[in-house]
Amino acid sequence: MSEPRFVHLRVHSDYSMIDGLAKTGPLVKKAASLGMPALAITDFTNLCGLVKFYGAGHGAGIKPIVGADFNVHNELLGDELTHLTVLAANNTGYQNLTLLISKAYQRGYGAAGPIIERDWLVELKEGLILLSGGRMGDVGRCLLRGNQALVEECVAFYEAHFPDRYFLELIRTGRQDEETYLHAAVELAEARGLPVVATNDVRFLESDDFDAHEIRVAIHDGFTLDDPKRPRNYSPQQYMRSEEEMCELFSDIPEALENTVEIAKRCNVTVRLGEYFLPQFPTGDMTTEDYLVKKAKEGLEERLAFLFPDEEERKKRRPEYDERLDIELQVINQMGFPGYFLIVMEFIQWSKDNGVPVGPGRGSGAGSLVAYALKITDLDPLEFDLLFERFLNPERVSMPDFDVDFCMEKRDQVIEHVADMYGRDAVSQIITFGTMAAKAVIRDVGRVLGHPYGFVDRISKLVPPDPGMTLAKAFEAEPQLPEIYEADEEVRALIDMARKLEGVTRNAGKHAGGVVIAPTKITDFAPLYCDEEGKHPVTQFDKSDVEYAGLVKFDFLGLRTLTIINWALEMINKRRAKNGEPPLDIAAIPLDDKKSFDMLQRSETTAVFQLESRGMKDLIKRLQPDCFEDMIALVALFRPGPLQSGMVDNFIDRKHGREELSYPDVQWQHESLKPVLEPTYGIILYQEQVMQIAQVLSGYTLGGADMLRRAMGKKKPEEMAKQRSVFEEGAKKNGIDGELAMKIFDLVEKFAGYGFNKSHSAAYALVSYQTLWLKAHYPAEFMAAVMTADMDNTEKVVGLVDECWRMGLKILPPDINSGLYHFHVNDEGEIVYGIGAIKGVGEGPIEAIIDARNQGGYFRELFDLCARTDTKKLNRRVLEKLIMSGAFDRLGPHRAALMNSLGDALKAADQHAKAEAIGQTDMFGVLAEEPEQIEQSYASCQPWPEQVVLDGERETLGLYLTGHPINQYLKEIERYVGGVRLKDMHPTERGKVTTAAGLVIAARVMVTKRGNRIGICTLDDRSGRLEVMLFTDALDKYQQLLEKDRILIVSGQVSFDDFSGGLKMTAREVMDIDEAREKYARGLAISLTDRQIDDQLLNRLRQSLEPHRSGTIPVHLYYQRADARARLRFGATWRVSPSDRLLNDLRGLIGSEQVELEFD
């Protein structure tokens, strides 16, 4: 093989985030296809792709060179930033490069992102090779300006600190000033004896990727492509050129090519991957292994005392627990993981001791008895047949991995504790990368290409919003996408470009739960990435790479449900303390509570963890779970595999006796499998059951059985053939017929693909059960906690308020005196609306109000509140929102008076503050002591009409709390529906039609699997609700009426809804209230007395009627005198459309009782 002549030493991948298009894998693959012996990836101030690059490089026979590009501040050049490429020559250089990158982030960003000071290179110079940055480097900038003195100063610095390790970088990519700089640099090199090196400053794989790269950069920088102000810093020539192309390009400077190979030879970094380094856990004089044994045995004693309070029972059950504990401890210690268990034990115990709610454990870790004994998990693995080997397999060495759920509010306290315990330099969270996803990339590309918003929005909306959606999947799921792609060239160009950018790394963030704890400093293992202020460090390696690099990951996950349970318990235990009852321990509630299972079987699971979706409610209704094992099964069954395979139907039929029980199949079963499969009615539902079947039938160890389970999941033919023979041979040794064994093996293999981790299912089922139990026994406290957790999502709060009303719970409007930021329950058991859920108020103003209330007691009225709170925090807009929401209802006569008095109250408060500032007591100070007098200072005005009050509630709370818009229509609606309210509806006889009316509270159009469209809307008349279905013809005709907050009158057939257990209507005819009036009303009656009539009133009456004269309803004026009553019929040209606007105008003018519609 001939000696290489060129190596690429400056290449950006998409991890550069500001530019760079290709991922590390394709870059390595391209270099390999070009026959390159080595490659450097030098992303901008990061090594995010290093682990992947290192593995891919060695896999492809390419030497990976570790490096990074930097923005450098050199005080000689003022505030100007220059470029520099830094390569690691050896492991010391790699360590120094890591520190250089970390330091750049830790000091905070400049306008151009993270920056290094040139002087930092002095302390971290060992093992580093520098490329000058070409025309954008400090020497390059000085050369182009002809500032020889500065050139000399810059070069002297590098000669002094980096002799033979500083190279003048030469680039020929057709960009401005490159050749001018290149000739000056070559002259400088000859004059000073400096080496030169050629790079192509690579940003993409092929030349025709240039346009996609320009768009990628424009997306980051916020420009459109044709914006004349857009910087044009790149050229189509910055692709990965071949050795031949580079040799031709630099044929006049062969030394620049030779030096690329020499540098590649000098760069020899070994990155240690695949080893684990745990921090040392303090164990005093004991070894870590002995300390673990001691703590586990002590913990088991406590657990057994709780599980079996009866001493005889405990004595009887102890041996199986002792045996299992000894086996697990032996495996943990042999595999070298005692420290891991102790570290997790410590921070979980600290959390519990410091009031941080912790989940019962999730994932396969719940299968460990040692974890249960150490109180890492809260499920007895023996009771629920959970297997340790599913978590830690002695036959397959891999790190244990506990996923620990913490209360969202307090999770950061635990991370702070860990940082305090092991050292802040040793603890970090983990980076995660955002990529250009299907929907967003269409919007981004469309914007950069300059397309109108509507055009881009139409295409983007065709991409389903499902997680993990890709453009390829979207083209399969949405038939309109391929249609418009083929029909419209602009659409095709946009989507083709979006495909090139889809999946490209866009930004970096913080992983939801991953935390690493290093035995020394984090930077000994990975560089750090920080936010713009240099805070919140995360490792630059993602969660899989950071483990491969040797750091052990701990998952500190935030689970909202734990926060809900904690809030509910705080309210419950406050009430119990008042009643002299002991606090409720949620971990000690019985798992067989009848009230809870009755509620579950009725599918009343809104707000219950994991069980609140429509599909899950349907499954619950069919399954009718009546024990905790059924709840574990629910979590495992509600997944696409079991639902689509028919497994769910078999499970339900077997539970209810409609299908014969067999273990696992009527034709092929064995009695020894009954104990394994009995909890799931003979269905192979869990991965643990797959392992137990292999153990029972064929004598597998549980470690070996776990390997079998994995092999079945991967479906590798050669591995499966090997496992089949092992399974058959083992079964024969156990005296089981070989054919039967193979048939059962086939069944196990079939179901293994659907099998779920029972440990995870059981742990989540426990949290589900706890929320179910709280909803059944403490409904007000539980629902108040749930609404608090969803305060920022008004739509969710609206649904939860509906659920409260369905449950018969009373919800009071927010109250400035008794209310809190959160929803809470008062002494009467009523839920008081959280002030924090009022839209447009914010936390600062609420804190100011509550502080003032805590200091001076309840507010007496609006003037008192304004005087006692900081009006800088509590401005007029916020006060208006509070009045509209009802929060001030107890402070004044009515909301209109409060609103009209607001200006005076704020003015008085301002005067009061000024007087206090100069130490005076003014008239307001006296008035504040006399509420009766203040009452008189409210503006004199009429109360708002009910609709205005309700609109204010809707605007600020997202719902109607003290009334309902339909109230004003009830009398009228009775005419259309024959007096039948929704709660009184019954299924209609075949062919018969009935009429229903109500306010639309939800409306949507969905597409069935067959591609048919169905409209669904929910009507509410305050007495009840009805779901209305509109199929194809009806939907085409009436879809424009399916709008939230519209009053609809619907005729159709009513039938039972198997899903909800209620009723549903299939619509034939739909009208809104205006159409219904036009159809059914016979006149508009206006009643006036002789005392009311004058020219002014008649003129205003004419003005009110004028805009509505294009209708069909005659107007009748009833004139009332003491001695007579007359009816005047307006002429045909005065027929009107009786809209809400007209009726409200007339009622405001004459009076509500004097305007009404007439019917036959």
UniProtKB/Swiss-Prot annotation:
The UniProt subunit note reads as follows: The DNA polymerase holoenzyme is a complex that contains 10 different types of subunits. These subunits are organized into 3 functionally essential subassemblies: the pol III core, the beta sliding clamp processivity factor and the clamp-loading complex. The pol III core (subunits alpha,epsilon and theta) contains the polymerase and the 3'-5' exonuclease proofreading activities. The polymerase is tethered to the template via the sliding clamp processivity factor.
What InterPro entries does the annotation carry? DNA_pol3_alpha_NTPase_dom, DNA_pol3_alpha_thumb_dom, DNA_pol3_finger, DNA_pol_IIIA_C, DnaE2/DnaE/PolC, DNAPol_HHH, NA-bd_OB-fold, NA-bd_OB_tRNA
Keywords attached to this entry: Cytoplasm, DNA replication, DNA-directed DNA polymerase, Nucleotidyltransferase, Transferase
**This protein's name:** DNA polymerase III subunit alpha
Locations listed in the record: Cytoplasm
Residues in coiled coil? none
Please list the reactions this protein catalyses.
DNA(n) + a 2'-deoxyribonucleoside 5'-triphosphate = DNA(n+1) + diphosphate
Lineage in the entry? Bacteria, Pseudomonadati, Pseudomonadota, Gammaproteobacteria, Enterobacterales
Single Gene Ontology MF annotation: nucleic acid binding
Give EC number(s), comma-separated.
Answer: 2.7.7.7
Among PANTHER family, the record links this protein to: DNA POLYMERASE III SUBUNIT ALPHA
**Is-annotated flag, keyword Zinc-finger?**
no
Gene3D superfamilies associated with the record:
1.10.150.870, Bacterial DNA polymerase III alpha subunit, thumb domain, Metal-dependent hydrolases, Nucleic acid-binding proteins
Q: What top-level class of enzyme does the UniProt entry assign?
A: transferase
Q: Which GO terms describe its biological process?
A: DNA replication
Pfam families reported for this sequence? DNA_pol3_alpha, DNA_pol3_finger, DNA_pol_IIIA_C, HHH_6, PHP, tRNA_anti-codon
Record has Cytoplasm as a keyword: yes
* Main location group: cytoplasm
- What species is this protein from? Salmonella typhimurium (strain LT2 / SGSC1412 / ATCC 700720)
Q: Name one GO cellular component term.
A: cytoplasm
> What protein family is recorded?
Belongs to the DNA polymerase type-C family. DnaE subfamily.
* Protein function: DNA polymerase III is a complex, multichain enzyme responsible for most of the replicative synthesis in bacteria. This DNA polymerase also exhibits 3' to 5' exonuclease activity. The alpha chain is the DNA polymerase.
